[in-house]
């Protein structure tokens, strides 16, 4: 079984090219593949297929709204094996892989996801690196029903803004938090939040106030833990930072441990632009894969 390994600002993925959607991706198999000691190691797995093939194979119950059968489809799994609606860094790496492998020749095309269609623009790409923009759709802030959204991260309580970017986020901007304090925060430790507000869990971002157009962010992703970057999380962070500044739209650089991305928020949608790197290509032992499914 062939694979590729890539990352977007060090949010890393194993890509499995499975255009007929025939692979059996169990939670156990995905978790083993993502394990950094007994597998290849990754924050998640990207199955490369089309929406029509995924629906025909039963991977999808139905085509997501706005996604056509002949659109590419990113079947994304978190490192614990759970299915995720969307991954902004993953879409960039997915699009880069399509171009680098010759499966796609266009500069602009659609990548489908459970969260819907994500139009991409490949500004530049070669076998190793790419610069990709993704139309992430409109990021919607969520009401709290009169109860504040809060999370505890690294033993510290933060107020946050709930943002839907195709998946749920709690973006916690602390105007008093310094870059050094953010770097010292234990984001890898389990986070706590009101499960009644987020019954399906939530991705939690902690960020500084913007300075010279730059926001510093760290993230604890549901189903994964701390990652070096989270594409949808950077969009949520940009929305929170703009909202705190009294703005509805704007462009910010979001600096995560894995690098920088640029997020633009408009009245109608949001855009995420950043790098992708393809690191390796290889083959997974069929015997190991079968054992990992158990």
From Swiss-Prot:
Q: What's the name of its gene?
A: dapF
Which InterPro entries is this protein grouped with? Answer: DAP_epimerase_AS (IPR018510), DAP_epimerase_DapF (IPR001653)
Its BP terms in the Gene Ontology are: lysine biosynthetic process via diaminopimelate
Marked site: Could be important to modulate the pK values of the two catalytic cysteine residues: 169, 221
Q: Where does substrate bind?
A: 11, 78, 88-89, 167, 203, 221-222, 231-232
Which Pfam families does UniProt cross-reference here?
A: DAP_epimerase (PF01678)
What is this protein's record name?
Diaminopimelate epimerase
> Known catalysed reaction(s)?
(2S,6S)-2,6-diaminopimelate = meso-2,6-diaminopimelate
Task: Tell me a GO cellular component.
Answer: cytosol
Similarity comment: family membership = Belongs to the diaminopimelate epimerase family.
List, alphabetically, the PROSITE patterns matched.
DAP_EPIMERASE
* Keywords from the named record: Amino-acid biosynthesis, Cytoplasm, Isomerase, Lysine biosynthesis
Q: Which SUPFAM superfamilies match?
A: Diaminopimelate epimerase-like
| Species this protein is from | Mycobacterium avium (strain 104)
Description of how the protein assembles with itself and partners:
Homodimer.
